[in-house]
Curated annotation (Swiss-Prot):
Gene: fbp
Protein name: Fructose-1,6-bisphosphatase class 3
Cofactor names: Mn(2+)
GO BP terms: gluconeogenesis
Keywords: Carbohydrate metabolism, Hydrolase, Manganese
Entry similarity comment: Belongs to the FBPase class 3 family.
Pathway, per record: Carbohydrate biosynthesis; gluconeogenesis
Lineage: Bacteria, Pseudomonadati, Bacteroidota, Bacteroidia, Bacteroidales
Keyword Translocase: no
SUPFAM superfamilies linked to this entry: Metallo-dependent phosphatases
Pfam families tied to this protein: FBPase_2
One Gene Ontology molecular-function label: fructose 1,6-bisphosphate 1-phosphatase activity
């Protein structure tokens, strides 16, 4: 920047620079900050982890965070390659992953605990020193627990190998042990290692669904140091339920009952399902509900025959209510073009058939005691009373409100970060590769504008701010996003819930995928989408989840010559057989991209007691031509902008446009 340009720019920004001068009141202050920022720009970029489609599998998710997708184990192997046996390295890793539980186990087995403390504390200091090496001291300090901040800083920055400091470092460790603080210190160090190994976490949708622990995943995320989430179709269903959308509420209950996992509903959010159980027993007491038996293979708890039958009755009851409620929205919103999803009025119970697309199909279940053939979409008095009670339960859940606030604060329909475009499922497209126009409240949107508008409507549905017409539309639209043909979170011809439940013929179950899912295999289409979202850089990518990658059938998660990465590898246990693996983590560190392919996680107990880790295979996706530094990232661009502003402030000071002030001593 030339002197003339600086002078003109300073004059234009003088009011802002006067505000900046409050933080940097002297030339020395501004100069020091420039030096600090320039130094940060030349540190290696932090490690980003990308995960998707967790589907309530809290134990596997928690373990992947704790072991940083194998990064902790790799660092332990590098540091102690020839100085520790494999069994000792395994024990150290297990301690880092689960410090509280592992300590209890070790204290019950270890004969010389003081010696173990001495050895282990020194090992943890070495690991922590390694994982903190790419960060500034300031950043590490902010991550430290307050009670041990000073001590950990001393241990990280002083070496026991240095003759002048060896006694000093040794005495710190001895005193930690003698004062009875070793356990707390070990826990603090292990948590710090976990935190520093992952700098930024991206969740590309579907925290919720069939698994038992979505609420536990949300508990972890709400306390996590740095993350973002791109909403998925299952997430939007729960967001709709939290917004008071009755169809979304019926859907989430149906999904939980279908897989026999009520933990998130009942234990996590305190949803009272007793009214549903009472209604189901009365309405379907003599009905075997054979089509609605829960898929108990992956249920959170073993169930006896009586419980299984009750869940089947509840499952059927809420399914029929769901179809009725869907009909109300579809009639109210003809612009959704979902008339083909209104099937109740096509049922002929006397003949036991349903009429679809000019053909009669035999119903597998003809016991519909709450269906009025004259007005099939009308809820019975008992159903209305039931859904009102369930709605109250959802609206009263404080834990759900907390999790949703976190979801909105850290989430969105998409994210652009460090030359990567992240979204869960789709960008609606035409078969010719152009962006598909989607009409919302009388106006057409496509591409990035569509996702921005959808994001806005989701927030309107939950927070209920704005014009009444838009609030009411958003309240219905949040359900449309779950199964509407032009939803960026679905993008299929239909959701065949009714057909799969009641019709044998597989031809009726077919859901045609939108054009995006085939077009994304082409590099030029990916470039078109990246351009639409303003993603720049030599190495730019789209990162999706949503569609499981069947690696056991030879399917490749890396598509379009490396421009497209699909990382739904099947965290959910029911998908393990389908994909052949148990999930992916995409890791983006200073040297490039790696895709980590996980085997199934056995259990937290085995990880603690036997040191059993997830077996992972690392695939190199892309190596950078040079090591990526902070200056190569979005954060680096922000820092460079700050440096330019500080340089203008220096110019203003040195040319008398702003007067220096003495810094007040604190």
């Amino acid at each position: 920047m030339t002197k003339d340009i600086i002078a003109e720019s300073v004059q234009n920004d003088l009011r802002y620079l006067q505000l900046l001068a409050r933080s940097f009141p002297t030339i020395a202050d501004a100069s020091t900050e420039i030096i600090n920022l320039e130094a940060i720009l030349n540190l290696p970029k932090g490690t980003e982890h990308f995960l998707s489609d967790l589907h309530g599998e809290d134990q596997a998710f928690s373990h992947v965070l704790r072991n940083a997708s194998g990064a902790v184990k790799r660092k332990v192997n590098e540091i102690f390659s020839n100085t520790l046996r494999e069994s000792e390295k395994k024990e150290l890793c297990s301690l880092i992953y689960y410090p509280e539980d592992k300590l209890e186990l070790i204290k019950s087995q270890e004969q010389d605990l003081e010696d173990w403390y001495q050895v282990t504390l020194n090992q943890l200091v070495r690991v922590c020193r390694n994982v903190s090496s790419k960060y500034t001291r300031s950043k590490v300090r902010k991550a430290l627990p307050k009670e041990f901040s000073y001590i950990i800083q001393e241990l990280l920055h002083e070496s026991s190998v240095e003759p002048n400091k060896s006694a000093y470092v040794d005495q710190i460790i001895c005193t930690i042990i003698s004062t009875g603080r070793a356990d707390d210190f070990i826990i603090a160090m292990c948590n710090l290692i976990q935190r520093l190994t992952i700098d930024l976490l991206h969740i590309i949708g579907d925290i919720y669904d069939r698994g038992p622990g979505a609420h536990l995943i949300m508990d972890i995320l709400c306390d996590y140091h740095n993350f973002d989430v791109q909403w998925g179709n299952h997430d939007i269903l729960w967001m709709g339920a939290a917004s008071g959308n009755l169809v979304s509420i019926a859907n989430v209950i149906r999904m939980c009952l279908r897989f026999g996992n009520m933990a998130t509903l009942e234990d996590g959010y305190g949803i009272n399902l007793l009214p549903l159980a009472t209604f189901a027993m009365e309405a379907y007491g003599d009905d075997p509900c054979a089509l609605f038996m829960p898929k108990t293979k992956f249920a959170d708890n073993a169930m006896d025959e009586k419980t299984t039958r009750l869940i089947a009755q509840m499952h059927k009851a809420i399914t029929i209510i769901q179809f009725k409620l869907e009909g109300e929205i579809i009639r109210r919103r003809p612009e959704f073009e979902m008339d083909d999803r209104m099937l109740l009025h096509h049922i002929d119970l006397k003949r036991g058939v349903v009429h679809i697309d000019g053909k009669d199909y035999t119903l597998k279940d003809t016991n519909w005691p709450t269906l009025d053939p004259k007005d099939p979409y009308r809820l019975s008095i008992e159903e209305e009373d039931l859904i009102r009670k369930i709605l109250h339960s959802f609206e009263s859940s404080e834990k759900m409100k907390k999790h949703m606030r976190c979801f909105f604060r850290h989430g969105g329909m998409y994210q652009v970060c460090n030359s990567n475009l992240l979204f869960h499922a789709s960008i609606p497209m035409n078969p010719d590769g152009t962006f598909k126009s989607v009409r919302i409240l009388g106006q057409d949107y496509k591409g990035r504008a569509l996702l921005d508008r959808v994001d806005q409507l989701i927030r309107t549905a939950y927070f209920k701010t704005g014009e009444q017409e838009e609030v009411e539309y958003a309240h219905d639209y949040i359900w449309y996003l779950w199964g509407g043909k032009d939803s960026p979170l679905f993008d299929k011809s239909k959701m065949a819930t009714f057909e799969r439940a009641f019709i044998e013929e597989a031809e009726t179950h077919k859901e045609e995928k939108g054009a995006y899912y085939t077009l994304r295999e082409q590099e030029e289409i990916c470039d078109k989408i990246l351009d639409e979202f303003g993603v720049t850089g030599m190495h730019r990518h789209i990162i999706n989840g949503h569609v499981p990658v069947r690696s056991n059938q030879g399917e490749n998660p890396i598509k379009a010559n490396g421009k497209m990465l699909v990382i739904d590898g099947g965290f959910s246990r029911p998908y393990h057989l389908e994909t052949g693996i148990a999930g992916y983590t995409l890791v983006y560190h200073s040297r490039g991209f790696q895709l980590v392919q996980h085997e199934p996680f056995e259990s937290r107990a085995k990880a603690i007691e036997e040191g059993l880790d997830i077996k992972s295979t690392t695939i190199v996706v892309e190596l950078s031509s040079h090591r990526q530094m902070v200056k190569d990232t979005d954060k680096g661009a922000d820092l460079q902008s700050q440096i330019k502003d500080l340089e203008k402030l220096l110019y203003a000071y040195r040319n008398g446009l702003i007067k220096e002030k003495e810094r007040m001593e604190r």
